Amino acid sequence: MNASDLIRIMQFGDSVLPVGAFTFSNGVESAIQTGIVHDVATLKGFVLTALKQAASCDGMGVVVAHRAVVADDRDGIIRADWAVNNRKLNEESRLMATRMGKKLAEMSIHVVEHPLISWWLEQIKNGNTAGTYPVTQAVVMAAQGIGQREVVVMHQYGVAMTILSAAMRLMRVTHFDTQHILFELNHDIEKFCDIAEIGDINQMSSYVPIVDVLAAVHVKAHVRLFSN
């Protein structure tokens, strides 16, 4: 990998990329409020579950969309996007995916200036597609020539960091703890990337009941710091 590709991966995979990720907790807020997550060990377990679920749903969407971009199959990109959106059972998950996806597309047309990204944002604005974050990420990175494996890794990193960053504001956990968790999950992320690279829409699954239960709890929570 050359330096140019690496720095683009670092830029678009940065946890402070201005796409609104800081407003979401990926479900960990409710998990902490209900006591499911209460220490470093349970936080690590929650992140691991989220990464596995992301690999079998959003991660596969990333791969399918990336392959469609490479094949210049624009209908295939849209099919992948709706497949991701339709598998998000709770409203908060759909809101997170579509809000961040649109923000990424809006930012990227000013940074990358690629016709495919302009087309993609137009489809989102016209309601022709949902504009989920995983598929938008695939479109933006594939347009820059970044490989599918690297984009899946970016997505996995984003899932983990969204949860860990939120956890630091919600529970007694240190920077050292969260970085250690992320480091320890490296080998698991490698396996989850293999799952995502199956790249088959028909095998995409978002079945993690606890996530949807926590989302329902979060909707009715009296105090909320995050949007999900």
Swiss-Prot record:
InterPro entries: UreF, UreF_sf. Disulfide bonds: none annotated. The keyword Chaperone applies. It comes from the Bacteria. Its main location: cytoplasm. Keywords: Chaperone, Cytoplasm, Nickel insertion. GO terms for cellular component: cytoplasm. It is found in: Cytoplasm. GO terms for molecular function: nickel cation binding. HAMAP family: UreF (MF_01385). UreD, UreF and UreG form a complex that acts as a GTP-hydrolysis-dependent molecular chaperone, activating the urease apoprotein by helping to assemble the nickel containing metallocenter of UreC. The UreE protein probably delivers the nickel. Required for maturation of urease via the functional incorporation of the urease nickel metallocenter. Belongs to the UreF family. This is Urease accessory protein UreF.
